[in-house]
Amino acid sequence: MGNYSTAIDKKWQEKWAESGLYKFDPNKEGEKLYVLEMFSYPSGSQLHAGHWFNYGPVDSWARFKRMQGYNVFQPMGFDAFGLPAENFAIKTGIHPQDSTIKNIAKMEEQLKAMGAMFNWENEVVTCSPEYYKWTQWLFLKLYEKGLAYRKKAPVNWCPSCQTVLANEQVVDGACERCSTEVTKKDLTQWFFKITDYADELLDKLDDLDWPEKTVSMQKHWIGRSTGSQVNFKVKDSDLNFDVFTTRVDTLCGVSYVVLAPENPLVDEIVSAEQKEAVENYKEEAKKQSDIERQSISREKTGVFTGAYAIHPLTGKEVPIWVGDYVLATYGTGAVMAVPAHDERDFAFAEKFNLPINRVIEAKDGSETNLPFCEHGILVNSGEFDGLTTDEAKEKIVEKLASMGLGEKKVNFRLRDWLVSRQRYWGAPIPVVYCEECGIVPVPESQLPVELPYDVEFAPDGKSPLAKSEAFVNTTCPHCGKPAKRETDTLDTFVCSSWYYLRYPDNKNTEAPFNPELINKMLPVDKYVGGPEHACMHLLYARFITKALRDMGYLNFDEPFTSLTHQGLILGPDGLKMSKSKGNTISPDDYIKEYGADVFRMYLMFGFAYTEGGAWSDDGIKSVNRFVERIERIIDTAREAISKGENNKTTMDKAEKELNYWRHNTIKSVTDDTDKLQFNTAIARMMEFINALSKYTQEKEMNLDFLKDVVSDYLRLLAPFAPHFSEEQWSLLGNSYSIFNEAWPKFDPKALVKDEVEIAIQVNGKIKNKIMVSSDLDEEGIKAAALADEKIIASTEGKTVVKVIVIKGRLVNIVVK
């Protein structure tokens, strides 16, 4: 048993806190490094192993960078609003404010037990009025710039959570929070105009040091399509509608058009005979999520409206159908159907026996089956016959434009961000409604609009704040007459869309942040968190940064320069941890038994950081044995240094061998840690301890050299085992603190050995290993190999046919 324990953890945590070791000074020397882990929801009562995997290894990386001379800023806070706390309150009867404050206190205690160098003086908690005052300020600024607006729209509705969900919060047709099937509902809601930034959000992605998969996910979510907009007139009426298509070359193959069930045009054109069927279909469509409706594998459904459109080129009548695979929120809510050249249209046409008109053939004239979805040569297209797809796109749009029936168009999959929620536990939207003045933003001087405590928040589909007359009834800031407050609250993603800007200036009462300070501190240099936020938080934060830049508050384009996603720690059964499965891992129990550093090192050694894996009790025990072994070997070295006996001052063979391992380890650990490859960095330190152990068994040692080697090793170990290393550093007689020491630098010359080990093979089988001078030429190596006693015995009575020398590695002697 070693001496390392939680008592050592506590001792050094108190010392670090007393001395203000990690207090951040923006004016301190050294290049600024803003390191940020995505902050936690304090909805559960404590940190689990997954939280630790996010925070512990990144803290080690930040410590490593601090020792390299960077001025590291690593704050911590809590994403404290949102459904989890409110649902917990509904279940237990404990008010979300009370449970959140209690949970934050517990999580702060656990995070401090980790021994991380978080800058707690910069903490932010999004549910505090001091924070959400500025979330409301952000809303007002976006409203001023026309980037926040209110409209009635079909929205995603979760019947269980009784609230609206953004598109990004619907996963496979279900609520991401509770897995209930999502339906559609028409509601008047607040939106942020993220689509104004669609082009820049897409174009700047390739400039970021982000995981390729996350970049691809955002690109797909933004979904820029370059195509054409075509206008169709409705037969026997003044009505018309636009469709967006990327294949205008297939226009002459249109045999029907399809409107989304929510398209308002449907009610205007439906015939009396089809009205009941269309209404029934629209009701059914409301029960389907957008993702389900667009599934390629799902059987297509639809209903005829009884109305017809006029083809813009041929003048022919084409039937107008309603189909739920068309979304009102994408493009124009209407599509032209070309079943001969689109798989979805083909399936629909076959099901409802609609015409299928081929207008594209293969370029080489070969026979092709329908649907034929490739580019090719136009046929059955009148004046456009014989043109290639690309030529036809240009010519057809030119003709449509000359007739006032079409134009080139860029379309996006991205929709505006729906930010209002019919729930209690969120930042109130700072708006009042006045019969005289209409929508009136609350003046900045009246912020924050505080969330009342005494509110009935059980969900019933209405905003809980609407039940509080004291909250709702107010006076209009503009005319002074009675007015009503907005009773929806802001999506919690609004709170987290700007929190990284508040950390460096969290005590500012006059503004959300000082632009001069923030422009010096930002962007975040290293951001770490889960990949599940690729199309939500990470996209929203980019939008808010760009909007504030354009308002003149920021001088940078992107919030997070470099992004890393940590992997997932699974339960011992290989399944995702959950209380219901009974496979959760509580860090507290393991820390109590082994200490925080052993727990941290197991997470870093037992798993590749970006991959994760299944928890293993055997793994943490082996790391504990490794730490105990380090302690024993350093104790032996320290005792030898203290006694000063059998000392020598020369650098002989044993010293050179240890020096080689010392600098090899410095190089490897530095390179691996920089790339967040912590498991291989620790493996290198395990290898080194073998070399150090071997050296401490020498009869004579160079004790000054030994102390330097042990000091270097402790500096390498310090970011991974901060409490243990600080203790060992102190016991070695060094001044406080090891984290004020510089990171060791490797000496390339030390990696050049005087002698190298050469394996000698006879007919491909290793017979012996010998040491030779590293500068010995091939002839010399060959001679040394042939002169070796074991090789002489192995080749006796045989003829040497050939000797192959691979310098620095092996000799293969071919005999017969």
UniProtKB/Swiss-Prot annotation:
Motif location ('KMSKS' region)? 576-580
Q: What is the native source organism of this protein?
A: Clostridium perfringens (strain ATCC 13124 / DSM 756 / JCM 1290 / NCIMB 6125 / NCTC 8237 / Type A)
Name it: Leucine--tRNA ligase
Motif 'HIGH' region extends across 40-51
* Key words of the record: Aminoacyl-tRNA synthetase, ATP-binding, Cytoplasm, Ligase, Nucleotide-binding, Protein biosynthesis
Indicate the family of this protein.
Answer: Belongs to the class-I aminoacyl-tRNA synthetase family.
Q: Which Gene3D superfamilies match?
A: 3.10.20.590, HUPs, Isoleucyl-tRNA Synthetase, Domain 1
| Principal place of residence | cytoplasm
Note one Pfam family from the annotation. Anticodon_1
Transmembrane ranges, per UniProt, are none
Give the top-rank taxon of the lineage listed in the UniProt record for this protein.
Bacteria
Q: Which reaction is the catalytic activity of this chain?
A: tRNA(Leu) + L-leucine + ATP = L-leucyl-tRNA(Leu) + AMP + diphosphate
An MF annotation (GO) of this entry:
leucine-tRNA ligase activity
Write down the top EC class of this protein.
ligase
What's in the GO CC field? cytosol
> Could you tell me where this protein is found in the cell?
Cytoplasm
